[in-house]
Amino acid sequence: MALDKTYPIFTVRWLAVHGLAVPTVFFLGSISAMQFIQR
């Protein structure tokens, strides 16, 4: 637990990347589903 000051920065950055990546994948999946429904 010596890296207690450096670790939260990496954790916040990791949470921000996943917080943006997960809705993006879900949004792309919904767009592809709507395109399959329209055709």
Swiss-Prot record:
Entry protein name: Cytochrome b559 subunit beta
Family classification: Belongs to the PsbE/PsbF family.
Transmembrane segment boundaries: 14-30
SUBUNIT field: Heterodimer of an alpha subunit and a beta subunit. PSII is composed of 1 copy each of membrane proteins PsbA, PsbB, PsbC, PsbD, PsbE, PsbF, PsbH, PsbI, PsbJ, PsbK, PsbL, PsbM, PsbT, PsbX, PsbY, PsbZ, Psb30/Ycf12, at least 3 peripheral proteins of the oxygen-evolving complex and a large number of cofactors. It forms dimeric complexes.
Gene this protein is translated from: psbF
InterPro entries, alphabetized: PSII_cyt_b559_bsu, PSII_cyt_b559_CS, PSII_cyt_b559_N
Pfam family, one: Cytochrom_B559
Membrane topology: Single-pass membrane protein
GO biological process: photosynthetic electron transport chain
Localization annotation: Plastid, Chloroplast thylakoid membrane
Record-level Gene Ontology MF annotations: electron transfer activity; heme binding; iron ion binding
Keywords, in A-Z order: Chloroplast, Electron transport, Heme, Iron, Membrane, Metal-binding, Photosynthesis, Photosystem II, Plastid, Thylakoid, Transmembrane, Transmembrane helix, Transport
Cofactors, names only: heme b
UniProt cofactor note: With its partner (PsbE) binds heme. PSII binds additional chlorophylls, carotenoids and specific lipids.
Residues the record lists as binding heme: H18
Cellular compartments per GO CC: chloroplast thylakoid membrane; photosystem II reaction center
Function: This b-type cytochrome is tightly associated with the reaction center of photosystem II (PSII). PSII is a light-driven water:plastoquinone oxidoreductase that uses light energy to abstract electrons from H(2)O, generating O(2) and a proton gradient subsequently used for ATP formation. It consists of a core antenna complex that captures photons, and an electron transfer chain that converts photonic excitation into a charge separation.
Domain of life: Eukaryota
Chief subcellular location: plastid
